Regions:
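Helix-loop junctions and terminal segments of transmembrane helices
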Residues: 77-94, 164, 278, 282-322, ...
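Signature of the first transmembrane helix
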Residues: 2, 21-86, 110-119, 148, ...
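Interfacial segments at transmembrane-helix termini and the short loops linking adjacent helices
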Residues: 122-145, 315, 323, 332-363, ...
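Membrane-interface junctions at transmembrane-helix termini in multi-pass inner-membrane proteins
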Residues: 88, 150-173, 359-390, 431-435
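Interhelical loop/hinge segments that connect adjacent transmembrane helices in multipass membrane
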Residues: 6-26, 138, 213-256, 296-312, ...
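Hydrophobic alpha-helical transmembrane segments
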Residues: 139-143, 172-221, 237, 279, ...
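Membrane-water interface segments that mark the loop-to-transmembrane alpha-helix transition
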Residues: 25-40, 66, 75-126, 136, ...
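Membrane-interface "helix-start" segments
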Residues: 29-32, 140-144, 170, 225-229, ...
Length: 460
């Protein structure tokens, strides 16, 4: 096991101090995370294939509904506090034992509320999911999913604590354990218990991962803080800190639905299909790179106090991320029609031009992402919220104007780019003023030259 510092931070697997934040560390952290993510995705595909072959369309659809319920409850009831936990642990704002105690208390309280819903209200949840004609057939299954979502909530906090400790390999291993356990159990649960097995399967993998993750955290925690006192304060602490982030998650959903409604009103379902295809590809592209990096960048930034050291790390993170994203952005731009045809069909090739325009925003989005991690790691949630709300306002207002003036669906993609350009300017201003961050000449020149090259590739 790695040693724990007085602040509760665990040593990195490679080297301590600034070496840990070297370019080599970025490569190692990203390489391992993306490999684990690929394996986890592959195991998920295997699980879905087993469900589709031996369960058929009906059980596949049922599993999809149960997964939405499970994910919605566990993510929604976390109130965005997982980011707060990462910041607490990585910065030493609270000791590891205190953070574990507060998170444990919160999970216990929410678990109790979920138990009440599972016992007394599952029929109403089933009606909301399936309607009255089918609800009575799945009351028991819904109760199981509602109750098991407490395990999902606990796993969110386990992952957050380990992310705060920069335990990249441990987090990846837990995700692999969850995915492999689900894949191994899929055939037995689906063929033996049908719909009830589908309900069990949704949270099955997380049970195994939680056992391992909980055991690891228990070994890392020093001291024996009781989890029997201060329950109300624990909930108040987490919810008050994370409610703003939870509100932003809700805002993101509202923006997505609103923009889709505006596009549908202006360009019909065909236009919505093209816009959704391009947006899905561009957002997935960003997620594939940023999700693995987040487990390393966010907690490492949280452990940096002095602005010069923080600025050095931000510049290094930005340079590495740009070098990683840039060639892939050019490939996405050049192969967009092949990608669209492979993922969808020839009927969606009209989304190619939309995707090309949205690719222009990849470099600004990359810079913005790194600056956003710096703000979150410093606990500047209100500042982060201002930038997110500003971008959401531009997207909704801009799309409304585009549809009102009948400028064409391509203009929607340009609104997307404009929103991220404004977002970048705001993030830069806040980062300089509130964090005293300074992007060096190398980072600025790299971002500007890559933006220019992507633009030239688009125009050619």
């Amino acid at each position: 096991m790695h040693s724990v510092s007085p602040k509760g931070k665990v040593g990195d697997a490679s080297a301590p101090g600034f070496r840990r934040r070297s370019l080599t560390s970025f490569v190692q952290a990203f390489g391992f995370s993306i490999s684990a993510m690929t394996l986890t995705t592959g195991l998920g595909v295997i699980s879905n294939k087993i469900i589709a072959v031996w369960g058929g369309p009906e059980l596949s659809g049922l599993v999809a509904v149960f997964r939405q319920l499970y994910g919605g409850l566990s993510q929604g009831l976390s109130f965005g506090a997982d980011v707060v936990v990462v910041q607490w642990v990585s910065s030493g704002q609270k000791t590891l034992s205190t953070t574990v105690r507060i998170a444990s208390q919160y999970v216990l309280i929410i678990g109790g509320l979920l138990a009440v819903v599972a016992v007394f209200l599952p029929q109403w949840v089933a009606i909301g999911l399936f309607g009255r004609p089918l609800a009575s057939s799945y009351v028991l299954e819904v109760a199981v999913v509602v109750m098991s979502s407490a395990v999902g909530l606990a796993m969110i906090f386990v992952i957050a604590i380990l992310n705060g400790l920069v335990r990249v390999r441990t987090v990846a291993a837990l995700n692999i354990i969850a995915a492999s356990t689900t894949a191994a159990a899929a055939y037995l649960l689906i063929t033996r218990w049908a719909s009830f097995g589908a309900a069990l399967l949704v949270g099955f993998g997380n049970v195994a991962a939680l056992i391992v993750g909980g055991w690891l955290i228990r070994r890392l925690v020093s001291g024996g803080d009781s989890i029997r006192h201060g329950l109300v304060n624990a909930v108040r602490t987490l919810v008050s800190s994370g409610s703003l982030l939870a509100g932003l998650n809700i805002l993101a959903t509202v923006v997505l639905l609103t923009v889709q409604a505006i596009v549908t009103r202006g360009y019909g379902l065909e236009g919505l299909a093209l816009y959704s295809a391009s947006a899905t590809i561009s957002n997935t592209f960003m997620m594939l790179f940023m999700s693995p990096m987040k487990t390393y960048v966010l907690p490492t930034l949280g452990g940096l106090g002095a602005s010069p050291e923080r600025s050095r790390f931000v510049n290094r993170a930005l340079q590495f991320t740009l070098l990683l994203v840039f060639p892939c952005a050019l490939a996405l731009l050049g192969l967009r029609n092949v990608i669209i045809q492979g993922l969808y069909s020839t009927e969606f090739l009209g989304a190619g031009e939309l995707l090309a325009i949205e690719t222009l925003a990849i470099i600004p989005r990359t810079v913005t992402w790194v600056l956003a991690m710096a703000l979150l790691s410093a606990g500047l949630y209100k500042t982060y919220a201002v930038t997110e709300v500003t971008r959401a306002t531009i997207l909704i207002f801009g799309c409304g104007v585009v549809v009102a003036l009948q400028l064409g669906i391509h203009a929607v993609a340009w609104v997307f780019c404009a929103a991220y350009a404004v977002d970048l300017v705001i993030y830069l201003g806040y980062s300089i003023r509130q964090l005293q961050l300074r992007l060096n000449a190398a980072s600025t020149a790299l971002a500007a030259s890559m933006m220019l090259l992507v633009t030239l590739a688009y125009l050619s």
